[in-house]
Amino acid sequence: MACTSNLSSLSKSWAVLDVPRGAPKATGLWLKRQFIFKTSRICMCMPTPTATQPIATPLIRDNESLLKYLRQPSVLPHEVDDSRKELLGRTRRQLRSTSEPLKAMNLIDTLQRLGLAYHFEDDMNAILSQLSSSGQSDGDLLTTALRFRLLRHNGHKIVQKFMDKNGKFKDSLKEDTMGLLSLYEASHLAANGEDILLEAMELTEAHLKQSLPSLPTQLARKVSSALELPRHRRMARLEARRYIQEYSEEIGHDPNLLELAKLDYNKVQSLHQMELTEISRWWKQLGLVDKLTFARDRPLECFLWTVGILPEPKYSNCRIELAKTIAILLVIDDIFDTHGTIDELVLFTNAIRRWDLEAMEGLPEYMRICYMALYNTTNEICYKILKENGWSVLPYLKATWIDMIEGFMLEASWYNNGQEPNMEEYVANGVTTAGAYMAMVHLFFLIGQGVTEENVKLLMKPYPKLFSCSGRILRLWDDLGTAKEEQERGDLASSIQLFMRENNITCDEEGRKRILQLIDNLWKDLNWELVSRDAMPLAIIKAAFNMARSSQVVYQHEEESYFSSVDNYVESLFFTPIIN
């Protein structure tokens, strides 16, 4: 289905809305799925609020409050959009007229970081294709590493030399902080087997940490930010918000480009508010949480993740439909996690396997309501895809839901029978119950680019490695972000505890360190999927990467509560515009 949006008719609004922070706390099965939006200890890598970047506190969690807020948009002034279009034209001319490779690469890099690259995809691809076909770069370390990172990030097959003729990194590189930083960022796109890049990662990290205390303030800030979270692992829209502030402080920045980035950010924010309005109205009409009062009422947080996975404005419809599936998934997760008896869960699982309305007859009333919501929503998505592209996709979407419900049921049976899975069993099943496969299969058809008979066959079990790598990163980061709170509640057996038991590790810090190493290895596997580009369209590859990025950004730290973290992201992305 073509996922497009009409930006010219959008509006923007912002306000402060104070809503109580209460939210249900998950208890029940000791094998917590904790999908995406459960209470957990995580925090966000957000820019520090400034005078030009006011941060309010919306605390909008329940759908009724969100709907009330979204009824008060103000119209985006036409003169603002006219100015944005003029700046877009000026930037396009600048990009096309830049003949020097380094200047072109720096401009592309800046456009990507400012969240503007989607406007110039054709022009940028032409430049990158020319760079790719021109062979090895003879420039300095900064230029060479930048070229490699841009080409690989955009799906070009590229092997780059970073060594001298003796196969060693030059000692002189240690004094080139910007070059080391560029190489450090590039090294995070390394795949398994690319030993030179992996060695470069260790070398540059060590030298950057060593030099950090003596660096000028602005450069030290850049280095600290990269060491905390490399750019390859950041959420695009959040990086745009952060980098707009950083770019404004850079000496010699392009004021026209900065102005364009601010206007465009606010424009996309207006689009997100319109999308939220549609999702919130749908959720209210669905009425699930009115009947299932134990279930989570968080369409806003569901939408936050879709923006992380699909940041480009053209995927507006995709975000809306994916947010619907996530919202229903959370309700089903709560049924398995906090409410359903084992006998009821068996009935529900069998009904999902049948996938017909008669299957509801033996279910409790609350399960019938949820079953009907899932059945109708999935069929409606299938109808939209059929109408748009002529594809009959119900067998594929239905199969992913069945797989996920069976995964929930497996966890319930482990608990009910007093069984403990091994690490691999837990993680493999946890990818399914985290919704990773469900989300990626839905997106494959919703995006609708590059769909072939060959790659459609890959959407059934066993799922593509692209999906499983991204899903495993999600699963492990989820456990890292929630483990301490789960222990405080008396929950058991996350991947961390299972790994520690299997490897005779008694120190929690060491266990977490080893899980982080597993995640790093999964990123190398994921990077290989970008290098190999077998059968999957680039848009789906990028979505899988973005799912992994979103999970790392969300669950990376433990100092803040989950809701505090989500509040920061939601406020920044959806409700607070960038003002001059």
Swiss-Prot record:
Positions of Mg(2+) 3 binding: 478, 482, 486
Pathway(s) it belongs to: Secondary metabolite biosynthesis; terpenoid biosynthesis
Entry text on domains: The Asp-Asp-Xaa-Xaa-Asp/Glu (DDXXD/E) motif is important for the catalytic activity, presumably through binding to Mg(2+).
Family: Belongs to the terpene synthase family. Tpsg subfamily.
Co-factor binding comment: Binds 3 Mg(2+) or Mn(2+) ions per subunit.
Subcellular location: Plastid, Chloroplast
UniProt protein name: Putative monoterpene synthase 8
GO BP, one annotated term: diterpenoid biosynthetic process
InterPro entries associated with the record: Isoprenoid_synthase_dom_sf, Terpene_cyclase-like_1_C, Terpene_cyclase_plant_C1, Terpene_synth_N, Terpene_synth_N_sf, Terpene_synthase-like, Terpene_synthase_metal-bd, Terpenoid_cyclase/PrenylTrfase
Source species, domain of life: Eukaryota
Species per Swiss-Prot/TrEMBL record: Coffea arabica
Any one GO molecular-function label of the UniProt entry: magnesium ion binding
Binding site for Mg(2+) 1: 333, 337
Motif interval(s): DDXXD motif: 333-337
Physiological role: Monoterpene synthase (mono-TPS) involved in the biosynthesis of monoterpenes natural products, constituent of coffee beverage aroma.
Gene3D superfamilies linked to this entry: Farnesyl Diphosphate Synthase (1.10.600.10), Terpene synthase, N-terminal domain (1.50.10.130)
Subunit structure: Monomer.
Alphabetized UniProt keyword annotations: Chloroplast, Magnesium, Metal-binding, Plastid, Transit peptide
Cofactors demanded by this protein: Mg(2+); Mn(2+)
Cellular component per GO, a single term: chloroplast
Expression sites (tissue/organ): Confined to flowers.
